[in-house]
């Protein structure tokens, strides 16, 4: 019975005994089921009415709450209202079916049982841990009334005792499993006399009426026997709770064949006892939300109102209940010390985090130290060795085998003792064991052993060197990943600077590590240990860091590129190049193929860092306000956050159910907003990646998001294809304001620097300015009007205003639409200036530099431009991306900017470096002549000038400034010819610069041009479906007419014959002297994309957009073989020199090698593809066999060499750009020339 009810009954006992008549009262109680017939008989046997009443009340006092209520109701029913009123205040809350009352969830029965059993009350500040409590209750219920053990184990301060008490605070558990009650014993660390005292006290408590013995047991054995008898006879089906058991010999004393729940740091204590055993491990962390809940209760604040330091405290201590409670109790007394206690945690000053509390220890270091001190002397030093481990790092057993020079079994036995005592944790993944320390244990060890740390790190390096060489670590070794990640850390911590430099400046180490973990961690280490590496050689350190930064997008891909070949592309002064050259020469002797880029000194790489965080297009990327981090989002539906300096990944979040279109950091960098095609806007914690809010009030995809520039009152603006802008207050669950006015999709929005205005851009052709406070429209500028022709205004013209950017002073706004940028005055709405970027691309994005008058502009034609907005002149071209550039953004200080692209990469550029560069870019229309040791390249540059480049010396002659569309060199380098966009053809004599111009002009752009071997005749083809044969010395011209559509290309044959192929699906053979068409082959239903002629001149091949290739004889009008199997357009083909093989390449990056005689497929050469990446980097556009037929070279997104015998790749050369159109190969197959889509010329030579 509840104490209150019992007291009330005792207080009014005299009045009740005087007045009540028991017979009618007992009838009611019998009918309620709370009094038995035998009890009624016992009452009736009393001689007087008062004695009968006294006997009834004595019986009720021994019963439960329900009996009290039944007695109260009987009094009311029989007219004793005054007496019932006396008992009214003592009426207990009767338990419901669940056994819980409405106030605390605990019945009076539970309270009474726990109070009598000495179970501790809940702490002053208490949060539930339902999952763990349920797990303990499930294990207890498994005992089913039989003797057994349930062990709760975990490290110091993880809340084991609180959980044990909470588990038995349950009505149904006590009533169903332990009706005999519970008995709590706080055991702790005991000697024999202390243990005897504990047992004596327990026996006394269990035998209060001294019915078994009137004296205390004199020794432990007697006490054990006494306990067994008491539990069996007086307290059957009761639960004995032993709190904080340290030793197995102590536990033996309580082994009395009863049901026992115990808490311990050492789960092996039950090894010495018999009976069923169940274990409940307790994690050392409460979890972030529970931790914050405890702090909020201590300081009496809402969880949402807690300062940022609260989150950091939970993060630092990993949610340790002991630490959170200690700090919470301290903060209750000193509520302004958040920063102070956080610093003490960060600086590992555990002694200063001290507070008397319900815990057994007043300070964190006490709780941990006692566990360590209790270790056996022979293993204490091994625990000290763990001081060198880093937080959150799981260490394979093999690492510690090397450290201690022991067999695996010996090491596992030692570590298991640490695990059993909750001093170490073990992650068992199949057969392999990995061990780790709690963060607080790491901090405790490093503080305790700080004077030994350098020697401990030196010890592990010395042991590593005995067992391993860094570059010989194999991925199948259990410990290899640990060494790749932490070898440099141990060397730096051991102050082994010489060894660290040797490691970090080794191309072998770079290769081995990047192949397994990618480049970001290595870049991080170069930054982390820069002060050490620079002491050795600053330039070398920069060489390696730049190499990793600029090749990061390649080094993170599969198949892993040949790092020696990448190293050969570095400047010749670079240490990376020198090591690569040395290694390549050794490997060439063993038959390996390597290429030297002999004209690379003319190339300047403008990117500072290239990262590839996504597996699909990157739609947006932005800097954090402190410039230290970059967030990016894209078509792979993820949000990525990485370090701006190294590209090291910090967060990867599966953010939305569809493509993520935009992301933005808040001004205080605490949050990141994302918006998506799935119509949702989400707010994330930028440090942890936790979802903070989800807003879904837009009815169409959300295109943009932007935070206010001040964190004083943080607002988020979003724009959607539903034509609306919305403002969101992060403290509210719903939209704060909706802005109506646009009549088409809102593409972009930006707050002004002072946050008073919000600018928005729309597909309706307008820029609108809104009052950020009232959400009213202030101004609207019709950008569309600037594109309308005054003479013929096309009102239905679509002008999409893509984006806008404010100047730093907020006086001007830059707006992008189509291929133009407009600058408007904010106050007058007047047009200040206009920038025209060119006809061939549209502007995707633009951004104002925060410091000066620079604007960065992203274009659809893969490039980025920098413009001076005052002079309206282009300052720089930045080429490097391989596809559309979707986003650009300056860093907060303007020193760098980032670009994000469809090619899955984000590039960082240094503003000053880019502005100083004025590199000339080439068009891909080039011709090459290999003459003895010379390589002469005729090329058209980006401003349509003609250049003659000596590939060996790099000398450039600028020949003409005509609008050249194609060009060629004569075989003996005496003449050059070029055609233009208007159809005109000219020949330039190189000796005297004399020009010969054809009187016979093509009607459309000239695309192909070639001299005959005697240099007297020039052949050209154009979009006009004609081929022109011009004997320029006699000024005579023959037109080859017969194709119905554009001539794709042509090839000269022997005996004045010419082979041509066309979009009309035919291949034709012409006599170029007479102009007669000699043969007409109807080859394909689709466009004929390429042809090649066998070296014996008896056959030719044709490939087509219909996904087939065919082999033809010049003597037959039907094909010899039709080659099927390609799944894309077959774009190129090539015969081997002996005419026995034919190679074909398609738009899926697949190459097939066929037997010419029977048409059988011999090899399928398809490079392995990453998810989202085309094989061969795109279309295969050109192929060429080596003279001996053993090797094949292919051009596509990059250049590959193949072993024809095996069909396997021999080497890959990654060009800076992509989409190579043609590869020019020297007759000896040792020199190769091509131009990528960035306009970079590559003259490659086989390394010998």
UniProtKB/Swiss-Prot annotation:
Residue stretches making up the CARD domain: 1-90
Listed name of the protein: Apoptotic protease-activating factor 1
Keywords annotated in UniProt: Apoptosis, ATP-binding, Calcium, Cytoplasm, Nucleotide-binding, Repeat, WD repeat
Domain notes: The CARD domain mediates interaction with APIP.
Biological process (GO), any one: intrinsic apoptotic signaling pathway in response to endoplasmic reticulum stress
Binding site for ATP: 154-161, 265
This protein's encoding gene: APAF1
Any GO CC annotation of this UniProt entry: apoptosome
Domain NB-ARC: 104-415
Effect caused by changing residue 368 to L: Activation of pro-caspase-9 independent of cytochrome c. Increased ability to induce apoptosis
Molecular-function GO terms, alphabetical: ADP binding; ATP binding; cysteine-type endopeptidase activator activity; cysteine-type endopeptidase activator activity involved in apoptotic process; heat shock protein binding; identical protein binding; nucleotide binding
């Amino acid at each position: 019975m509840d104490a209150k009810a019992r007291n009330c009954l005792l207080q009014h006992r005299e009045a009740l005994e005087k007045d009540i008549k028991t017979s009618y009262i007992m009838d009611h109680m019998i009918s309620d089921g709370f009094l038995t017939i035998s009890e009624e008989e016992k009452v009736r046997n009393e001689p007087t009415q008062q004695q009968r009443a006294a006997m009834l009340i004595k019986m009720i006092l021994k019963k439960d709450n329900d009996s009290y209520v039944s007695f109260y109701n009987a009094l009311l029913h029989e007219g004793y209202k005054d007496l019932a009123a006396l008992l009214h205040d003592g009426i207990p809350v009767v338990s419901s079916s669940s056994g819980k009352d409405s106030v605390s969830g605990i019945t009076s029965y539970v309270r009474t049982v726990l109070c009598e059993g000495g179970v501790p009350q809940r702490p002053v500040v208490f949060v539930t841990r339902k999952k763990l409590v349920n797990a303990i209750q499930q294990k207890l219920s498994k005992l089913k009334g039989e003797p057994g053990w349930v062990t709760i184990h975990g490290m110091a301060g993880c809340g084991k005792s609180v959980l044990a008490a909470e588990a038995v605070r349950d009505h149904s558990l006590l009533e169903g499993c332990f009706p005999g009650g519970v008995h709590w014993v706080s055991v702790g660390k005991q000697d024999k006399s202390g243990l005897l005292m504990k047992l004596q006290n327990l026996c006394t408590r269990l035998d209060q009426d001294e019915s078994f013995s009137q004296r205390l047991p004199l020794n432990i054995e007697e006490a054990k026997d006494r306990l067994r008898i008491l539990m069996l006879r007086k307290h059957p089906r009761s639960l004995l709770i032993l709190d904080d058991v340290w030793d197995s010999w102590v536990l033996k004393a309580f082994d009395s064949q009863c049901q026992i729940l115990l808490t311990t740091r050492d789960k092996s204590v039950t090894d010495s006892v018999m009976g069923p055993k169940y274990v409940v491990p307790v994690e050392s962390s409460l979890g972030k939300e529970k931790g914050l809940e405890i702090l909020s209760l201590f300081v009496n604040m809402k969880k949402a109102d807690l300062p940022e330091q609260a989150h950091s405290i939970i993060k630092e201590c990993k949610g340790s209940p002991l630490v959170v409670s200690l700090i919470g109790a301290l903060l209750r007394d000193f509520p302004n010390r958040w920063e102070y206690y956080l610093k003490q945690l960060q600086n590992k000053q555990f002694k200063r985090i001290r507070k008397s509390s319900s815990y057994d220890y007043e300070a964190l270091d006490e709780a941990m130290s006692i566990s360590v001190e209790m270790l056996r002397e022979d293993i204490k030093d091994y625990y000290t060795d763990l001081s060198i481990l880093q937080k959150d790092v799981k260490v394979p057993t093999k690492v510690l085998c090397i450290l201690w020079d022991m067999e695996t079994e010996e090491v596992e036995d030692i570590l298991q003792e640490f695990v059993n005592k909750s001093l170490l944790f073990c992650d068992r993944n199949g057969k392999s064991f990995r061990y780790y320390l709690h963060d607080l244990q790491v901090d405790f060890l490093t503080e305790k052993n700080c004077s030994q740390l350098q020697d401990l790190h030196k010890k592990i390096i010395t042991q590593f060197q005995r067992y391993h060489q860094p570059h010989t670590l194999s991925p199948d070794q259990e410990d290899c990943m640990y060494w790749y990640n932490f070898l440099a850390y141990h060397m730096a911590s051991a102050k082994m600077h010489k060894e660290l430099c040797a490691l970090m400046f080794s191309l072998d180490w770079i290769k081995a590590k990047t192949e397994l973990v990618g480049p970001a961690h290595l870049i991080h280490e170069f930054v982390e240990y820069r002060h050490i590496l620079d002491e050795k050689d600053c330039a070398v350190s920069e060489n390696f860091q730049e190499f990793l930064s600029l090749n990061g997008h390649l080094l993170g891909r599969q198949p892993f590129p040949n790092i020696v070949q990448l190293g050969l592309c570095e400047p010749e002064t670079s240490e990376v190049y020198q090591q690569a050259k040395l290694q390549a020469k050794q490997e060439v002797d063993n038959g390996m193929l390597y290429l030297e880029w002999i004209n690379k000194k003319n190339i300047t790489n403008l990117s500072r860092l290239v990262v590839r965080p996504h597996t699909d297009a990157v739609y947006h990327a932005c800097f954090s306000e402190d410039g230290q981090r970059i967030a990016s989002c894209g078509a792979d539906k993820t949000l990525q956050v990485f370090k701006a300096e190294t590209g090291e990944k910090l967060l990867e979040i599966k953010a939305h159910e569809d493509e993520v279109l935009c992301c933005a950091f808040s001004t205080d960098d605490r949050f990141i907003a994302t918006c998506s095609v799935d119509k949702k806007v989400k707010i994330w914690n930028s440090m942890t990646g936790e979802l903070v809010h989800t807003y879904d009030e837009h009815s169409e995809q959300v295109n943009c998001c932007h935070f206010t520039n001040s964190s004083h009152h943080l607002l988020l603006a979003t724009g959607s294809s539903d034509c609306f802008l919305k403002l969101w207050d992060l403290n509210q669950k719903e939209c704060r304001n909706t802005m109506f006015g646009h009549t088409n999709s809102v593409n972009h929005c930006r707050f002004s620097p002072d946050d008073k205005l919000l600018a928005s851009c729309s597909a309706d052709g307008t820029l609108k300015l809104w009052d950020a406070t009232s959400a009213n429209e202030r101004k609207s500028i019709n950008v569309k009007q600037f594109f309308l022709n005054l003479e013929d205004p096309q009102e239905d013209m679509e002008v999409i205003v893509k984006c806008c950017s404010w100047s730093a002073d907020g006086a001007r706004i830059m707006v992008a639409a189509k291929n133009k940028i407009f600058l408007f005055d904010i106050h007058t709405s007047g047009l200040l200036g206009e920038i025209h970027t060119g006809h061939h691309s549209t502007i995707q994005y633009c951004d104002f530099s925060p410091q000066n008058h620079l604007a960065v502009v992203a274009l659809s034609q893969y490039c980025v431009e920098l413009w001076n907005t005052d002079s309206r002149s282009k300052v720089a071209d930045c080429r490097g991306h391989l596809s559309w550039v979707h986003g650009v953004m300056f860093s907060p200080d303007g020193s760098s900017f980032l670009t994000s692209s469809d090619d899955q990469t984000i590039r960082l550029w240094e503003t000053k470096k880019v502005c100083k560069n004025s590199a000339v870019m080439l068009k891909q229309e080039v011709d090459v002549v290999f003459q003895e040791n010379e390589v002469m390249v005729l090329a058209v540059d980006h401003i349509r000038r003609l250049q003659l480049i000596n590939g060996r010396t790099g000398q450039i002659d600028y020949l003409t400034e005509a609008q050249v569309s194609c060009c060629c060199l004569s075989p003996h380098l005496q003449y050059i010819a070029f055609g233009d966009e208007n159809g005109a053809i000219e020949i330039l004599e190189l000796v005297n610069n004399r020009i010969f111009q054809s009187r016979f002009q093509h009607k459309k752009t000239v695309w192909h041009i070639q001299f005959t071997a005697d240099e007297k005749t020039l052949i050209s083809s154009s979009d006009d479906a004609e081929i022109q044969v011009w004997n320029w010395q006699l000024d005579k011209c023959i037109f080859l007419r017969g194709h119905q559509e554009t001539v794709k290309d042509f090839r000269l044959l022997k005996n004045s014959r010419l082979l041509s192929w066309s979009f009309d699906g035919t291949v034709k053979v012409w006599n170029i002297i007479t102009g007669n068409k000699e043969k007409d082959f109807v080859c394909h239903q689709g466009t004929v994309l390429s042809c090649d002629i066998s070296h014996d001149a008896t056959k030719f091949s044709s490939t087509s957009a219909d996904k087939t290739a065919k082999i033809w004889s010049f003597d037959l009008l039907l094909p010899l073989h039709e080659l099927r199997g390609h799944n894309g357009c077959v774009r190129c083909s090539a015969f081997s020199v002996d005419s026995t093989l034919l190679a074909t390449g398609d738009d899926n990056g697949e190459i097939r090698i066929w037997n010419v005689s029977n048409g059988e497929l011999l090899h399928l050469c398809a490079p392995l593809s990453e998810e989202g990446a085309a094989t061969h980097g795109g279309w295969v556009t050109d192929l060429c066999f080596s003279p001996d037929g053993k090797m094949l070279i292919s051009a596509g997104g990059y250049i590959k060499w193949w072993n024809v015998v095996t069909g396997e790749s021999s080497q890959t050369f990654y060009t800076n750009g992509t989409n190579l159109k043609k590869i020019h190969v020297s007759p000896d197959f040792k020199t190769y020339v091509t131009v990528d889509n960035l306009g970079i010329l590559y003259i490659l030579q086989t390394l010998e």
